[in-house]
A protein has these predicted regions:
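A detector of single, family-specific signature residues
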Residues: 1-421
């Protein structure tokens, strides 16, 4: 179906089984544009507040020309972009580019959870029909009926945080795999070492094994040079005495002197160090972004920049949650419930649905908060005194932390014991 966007032209559109003719006369109260986002192309639909269809179906390519075509089409509808609402689904990285393009042009863009769109579509029709064309139309209709909030500067910061924290999560996961390989290789080439150092993953040990990747090489190393390596990378914690202890142990080691194992060990160590440097760089960026947000949750003792970044990135706008219980459910920290007839289970497990990143961040943050704040530590100990398992007690304490975080974000106030304990 062709359509004309020039002012004064008669425009014919198709709506279900009805054909609607109207004259586009310029200024219209509100324009609603729905975009169904895909990898290579996007389907668009537009209507005004009177229900008149301006674009029945328009497909644009996911490229510069496609974006400009959409911009030119929408711009003709109304001189003021304040009267134009554009909606699209949050489809991960597929929606990022068109979202940034539209916001840079000054449009009010509304990012909608795909679950909301799905529920809305089911509520509008009993037919099991789902097409990109229909989805674009449903999104436009939701802009009229739903109380949605436009993408904002806060949304931008949250989006940036989310991208970085998830990248960090993946890198930490990769580093963990290589640390497992490191442990295996050290067990083969110098198994006695891990008994006399705090961790084989600490910098002093990594740099030592990177230069001397076998017990044989360590046993033959000059004591002065060995001491120099340990002192430099342990920042003075290891001295000549530790160097002597390590060298003597290396001379009695049962470890395998293998060229291939030593080579693999060096490469694994270099990968661990590289991943660590990347994680450190991400942490610097996270600190900058968290400082720009100036969030009150940083006032909670034990909440680090990294923890705050994960929590803020996953929560997004706290006003999307009606209560702390809703936020708890989003984190997947709800207890499961099983009931059948007269039977109700007395023991339940954590649901573990929702954001795994938020759940991980909250549980880790709770451990640190308990170390720094007496109120939280006492609460955890009270649960332990009830003979609850440590992780059950930690889960209860995490729920308390969620209530505190919710209160601080809702009221934009700093943490004060007498108010939130």
């Amino acid at each position: 179906m062709t359509f004309y966007l020039e002012r004064g032209y008669i425009q014919q559109t198709f709506c279900g089984s009805h054909c609607l003719n109207f004259i586009y006369k310029g200024a219209i109260n509100m324009i609603y544009v729905g975009i169904d986002v895909a990898k290579d192309k996007h389907d668009c639909f537009a209507m005004n507040s009177d229900g008149e269809i301006l674009i029945e179906h328009m497909t644009i390519q996911n490229n510069f020309d496609g974006f400009n075509s959409l911009f030119n089409s929408i711009s003709l509808f109304n001189e003021s972009f304040d009267n134009i609402k554009v909606g699209l689904e949050a489809t991960g990285h597929y929606s990022n580019n068109i979202l940034n393009f539209l916001t840079s042009k000054g449009f009010n863009v509304y990012v909608i959870n795909p679950l909301q769109t799905n529920l809305y579509r089911k509520g509008q029709s009993l037919r099991k029909t789902k097409t990109d064309k229909l989805d674009a139309r449903f999104i436009a209709t939701m802009l009229i009926s739903d109380n949605l909030k436009p993408y904002s500067n806060l949304s931008y910061h949250i989006s940036e945080l989310k991208s970085l924290v998830r990248h960090r999560f993946r890198l930490v996961h990769e580093r963990s795999k290589f640390k497992t390989s490191l442990s295996r290789l050290v067990t083969l080439v110098f198994p006695e070492l891990e008994k006399i150092v705090w961790s084989i993953s600490q910098n002093s040990v990594l740099y030592l094994l990177n230069e001397l990747p076998s017990a044989k090489e360590i046993s033959e190393c000059n004591l002065t040079h060995l001491t120099s390596i340990l002192e430099k990378y342990s920042k003075g914690k290891y001295s000549r005495d530790k160097a002597i202890e390590i060298r003597e142990l290396a001379r009695k080691s049962i470890g395998t002197n293998s060229r291939s194992l030593s080579f693999e060990l060096k490469q694994v160590i270099q990968t661990v160090l590289f991943l660590q440097s990347q994680i450190d760089d991400i942490d610097k960026e996270l600190k900058t972004l968290v400082n720009e947000l100036n969030s009150p949750i940083m006032s909670i003792p034990g909440i680090s920049y990294v923890s705050a970044a994960f929590i803020l990135a996953e929560i997004g706008d706290v006003n999307n949650f009606d209560s702390p219980a809703k936020l708890q459910a989003f984190a997947g920290l709800d207890p499961s419930t099983y009931q059948s007839g007269k039977y109700t289970a007395t023991h339940s497990v954590m649901v573990k649905r929702g954001s795994k990143y938020l759940r991980w961040a909250l549980l880790n943050a709770t451990r640190l908060v308990c170390m720094r704040d007496k109120t939280f530590n006492d609460y955890k100990n009270s649960k332990l005194a009830e003979r609850k398992h440590y992780f059950v007690a930690l889960s209860h304490t995490t729920k308390k932390l969620i209530r505190v975080i919710y209160y601080l974000l809702k009221t934009n106030t700093s943490y004060q014991l007498q108010k939130v304990a």
